[in-house]
């Protein structure tokens, strides 16, 4: 027997008569109280998004799944709910959470509370732990051999021991204060997001299953991804990298490496590349002749004197402003909708055949010659801009 209530329900008076109720879904209402003391057969409760100041579940010993996200609970007593396997209590003002009796718990979702500590020493069956956006300064995970997903970002962690979590596939630990991260035992790892920590080194040589790597906003001076041949997404922006070897990463579709110190970037093996952001580096050349699948290119604020895009016919967005370009031929890039090439000493810009331009900026350059033909189609706003900025051919 189950019950699902629609929105705008203010009271559940009379629910005590449903002695055999097993599932109750009453989320998104205005319930200020919820008495389930007579519903002892209840196994699943979804009461999220209600202004509940308290929730007494001491009589609901058969409860297996509980979702009380975004209520007003300052306390949550689950000591009698020993059958619980899944708990979601996000967005409450909880300062503590006692789960010592919930030894069957496999999924714990407790983000956006005010937790400063989380003792999970009795919850060795955990497979998913999402405890982000709290105030945690430490997290002991040594007992969780089965842990697959860990989201502990937006906390105050200074260290993270994952040596026993060999089943871990997804690790999101960004926005902490980590100075080191040992992943040598996490060979099953598929996704890693460790951006905005204090990492000076990152050894990924044992993480050959990795497909997504986000490690931006760290003081990394080098990054070796030569063994991570399955990578499809790499975001390593805002580091201190002087070199980046991607010749072994042929599956890459997205590379995001702005704000480093790169002087060269070899992309000849990355034929699947669709999005490239390499702005604010020290690149003097950029060969994209093998990257025919690329649709978005952000190479602004480098030192490029030339840019050949004749083979990149799938390109839809181009940001090459802030370089040293004197000419730019885009006549073969007929899918382009956005072009930003300002802050270059351009004397010639060829937009012949372009019929999809929505935005174009080439700066206040009275010497520029904009070449167009009958196939060139721009909006009235774009044409007005062009007429005011270009020299008449």
Feature roles, as predicted:
Residues 1-34, 39:
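LRR N-terminal entry segment and analogous cap-like coil->beta motifs
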Residues 1-5, 24-26, 43-47, 64-68, ...:
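Conserved hydrophobic beta-strand positions in leucine-rich repeat
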Residues 17-21, 38-42, 51, 59-63, ...:
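Leucine-rich repeat
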Residues 35, 77, 111, 140, ...:
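Intrinsic low-complexity/disordered segments
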Residues 65, 108, 149, 191, ...:
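N-terminal non-cleavable signal-anchor helices
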Residues 339-393:
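Leucine-rich solenoid repeat scaffolds
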């Amino acid at each position: 027997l189950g019950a699902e209530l629609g929105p705008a329900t203010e009271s559940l008076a009379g629910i005590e008569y449903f002695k055999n109720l097993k599932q109750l879904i009453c989320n998104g209402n205005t319930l200020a109280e919820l008495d389930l003391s007579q519903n002892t057969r209840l196994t699943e409760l979804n009461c999220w998004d209600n202004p509940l100041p308290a929730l007494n579940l001491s009589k609901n010993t058969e409860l297996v799944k509980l979702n009380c996200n975004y209520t007003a609970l300052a306390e949550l007593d689950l000591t009698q709910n020993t059958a619980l396997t899944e708990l979601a209590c996000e967005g409450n003002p909880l300062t503590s959470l006692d789960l010592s009796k919930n030894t069957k718990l496999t999924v714990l979702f407790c983000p956006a509370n005010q937790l400063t500590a989380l003792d999970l020493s009795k919850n060795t069956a955990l497979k998913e732990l999402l405890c982000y956006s709290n105030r945690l300064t430490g997290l002991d995970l040594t007992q969780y051999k089965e842990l697959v997903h860990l989201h502990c970002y937006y906390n105050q962690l200074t260290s993270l021991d994952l040596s026993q979590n060999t089943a871990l596939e997804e690790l999101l630990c960004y926005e902490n204060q980590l100075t080191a991260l040992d992943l040598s035992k996490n060979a099953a790892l598929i996704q890693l997001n460790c951006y905005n920590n204090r990492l000076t080194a990152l050894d990924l040589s044992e993480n050959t299953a990795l497909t997504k790597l986000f490690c931006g906003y760290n003081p990394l001076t080098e990054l070796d991804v030569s063994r991570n041949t399955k990578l499809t997404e790499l975001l390593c922006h805002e580091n201190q990298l002087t070199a980046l070897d991607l010749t072994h990463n042929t599956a890459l579709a997205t590379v995001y490496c702005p704000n480093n110190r790169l002087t060269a970037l070899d992309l000849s093996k990355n034929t699947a590349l669709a999005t490239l952001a390499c702005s604010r580096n020290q690149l003097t050349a950029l060969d994209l002749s093998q990257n025919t699948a690329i649709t978005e290119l952000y190479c602004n604020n480098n030192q490029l004197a030339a840019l050949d895009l004749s083979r990149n016919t799938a390109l839809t967005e181009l940001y090459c402003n802030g370089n040293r370009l004197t000419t730019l031929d885009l006549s073969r890039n007929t899918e382009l909708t956005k072009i930003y090439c300002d802050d270059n000493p351009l004397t010639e810009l060829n937009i012949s055949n372009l019929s999809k331009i929505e935005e174009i900026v080439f700066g206040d350059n009275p010497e520029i010659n904009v070449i167009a033909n009958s196939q060139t189609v721009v909006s009235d706003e774009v044409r007005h801009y062009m007429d005011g900025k270009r020299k008449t051919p």
